[in-house]
Amino acid sequence: DEAHNLLRLIDDIMQLSKLDELTHDMMEKFTLQDVAQSALARLKDKAGRLQVSLQLVDSTGGDSKLLGISSLMEEIFFNLLDNGLKYNHPGGEVTLRLSEGENKYTVSVADTGMGIPGSELPHIFERFYRVDRSRHKAIEGTGLGLSIVKHGVGFHGGSIRVVSTVGQGTEFIMKFPKPKYEAEK
């Protein structure tokens, strides 16, 4: 309903304004697993209502420490997972994958949803941008979630890219540097 949409817009704008105020002295140690579990728990009921499978695949060994702001990282995961649910279909899947290399962690969120046309991909991280609204009028959103994701990934020293095929789904792939104390193990 309209009141819910307005509340979501205000919340997203507040999130964006907070990003400008983040400083590195706010950083803390946290694990990607804890953040992933929190984001998944917040969306469990929605996934059930939409009849979309929501899963975590962790090939890291289970203790992937990162230095950053855990609440911001959770919001990154939440926004990507939520989009994967919203732009999917009953019987579809959304998978959050955690893996690691020598000096970095890779986090991906992949869905089996409707996909994003290639012509739209250069714009998806812009504030208030929504992919071809004529296709998605019934899907709620403010067009700010992916902008929050991009800024949050950048704050953590990471990178993000997207691979998508219309009718097959989308995958967002993020890479985050391991903290020096982790990379040297």
Cite the ranges covered by each PLM segment.
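Short conserved segments within the C-terminal catalytic ATPase subdomain
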Residues: 46-57
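Short conserved segment of the HATPase_c
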Residues: 116-128
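A conserved beta-strand-to-alpha-helix junction within the catalytic ATP-binding
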Residues: 28-44
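Short alpha-helical segment of the dimerization/phosphotransfer core of two-component systems
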Residues: 1-6
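Short helix-loop "hinge" at the ATP-lid/N-box region of the Bergerat-fold HATPase_c
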Residues: 84-85
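Conserved glycine-rich
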Residues: 157-158
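Conserved micro-motifs of the catalytic ATP-binding
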Residues: 21-28, 65-68
